[in-house]
Amino acid sequence: MSFTVVIPARYGSSRLPGKPLADIAGKPMIQHVVERAEASGAAEVIVATDDMRIKEGVDKFGGRVMMTSSEHSSGTERLAEVIEQLALAENEVVVNVQGDEPFIPPEIIRQVADNLANQRQAPMATLAVPITDAEDIFNPNTVKVVTDAAGYALYFSRAAIPWDREHFSADRATNVVTEHYHRHIGIYAYRAGFVRRYIEWEPSPIEQLESLEQLRVLWHGERIHVAEAILAPATGIDTEEDLQRARKLAGDG
């Protein structure tokens, strides 16, 4: 099954400026992401950026890069521009991989693409992993997802969902049974035609409250299929501390 990977990459980051080009084990972070995406078996891997510094960095290691508008407010809008530039067919599967995931397993990139290809009821698919640390349930940086019996998302939230009324009180938990909780992984597969529709929708109130773009899909009545990832990726890199941990993990810190 053929699919395309698009990696949106911005130079400007409030917490870690220039992070796509941050060195990890002698390579820029974005190169690690590209190489893992290529190892997934994708037909094409494209970095989408609005910054010449990132373009030049990708050119140096021979990756494919597309320049996109600096007016985009989200990675999905940047993805949509790439879809138009490539003139992808409506049913072409496109996987959006975050540019700050240098250790993302290639296997789960392929998994989310295959998952969408096998879905007839959803135009979009993503992944989650079980939460094993109760503290993550209350961490707003850990996005939780609840699904129905068939694996379709009911809701994504930074809050503790579902709420365990037997064991939760305000902001802490005791004797939590974590088996009911899943952490959302920020990797998505879409059908190209759906992305074209998505960017025409106005941002939804719940999306703006939670600052979770995927809630726009549920708000407008579409479905997102969520599968359990076959491998749990390391968390992405957002801060200098994250970067130092990544360097140690890569053996150069």
Swiss-Prot record:
It catalyses: 3-deoxy-alpha-D-manno-oct-2-ulosonate + CTP = CMP-3-deoxy-beta-D-manno-octulosonate + diphosphate. It is found in: Cytoplasm. Keywords: Cytoplasm, Lipopolysaccharide biosynthesis, Nucleotidyltransferase, Transferase. InterPro entries: Cytidylyl_trans, KdsB, Nucleotide-diphossugar_trans. Pathway: Nucleotide-sugar biosynthesis; CMP-3-deoxy-D-manno-octulosonate biosynthesis; CMP-3-deoxy-D-manno-octulosonate from 3-deoxy-D-manno-octulosonate and CTP: step 1/1; Bacterial outer membrane biogenesis; lipopolysaccharide biosynthesis. Its EC number is 2.7.7.38. GO terms for molecular function: 3-deoxy-manno-octulosonate cytidylyltransferase activity. GO terms for biological process: CMP-keto-3-deoxy-D-manno-octulosonic acid biosynthetic process; lipopolysaccharide biosynthetic process. The keyword Nucleotidyltransferase applies. Pfam families: CTP_transf_3 (PF02348). The keyword Lipoprotein does not apply. One of its GO terms (cellular component) is cytosol. NCBIfam families: kdsB (TIGR00466), PRK05450.1-3 (NF003950), PRK05450.1-5 (NF003952), PRK13368.1 (NF009905). Belongs to the KdsB family. Activates KDO (a required 8-carbon sugar) for incorporation into bacterial lipopolysaccharide in Gram-negative bacteria. PANTHER family: 3-DEOXY-MANNO-OCTULOSONATE CYTIDYLYLTRANSFERASE, 3-DEOXY-MANNO-OCTULOSONATE CYTIDYLYLTRANSFERASE, MITOCHONDRIAL. This is 3-deoxy-manno-octulosonate cytidylyltransferase.
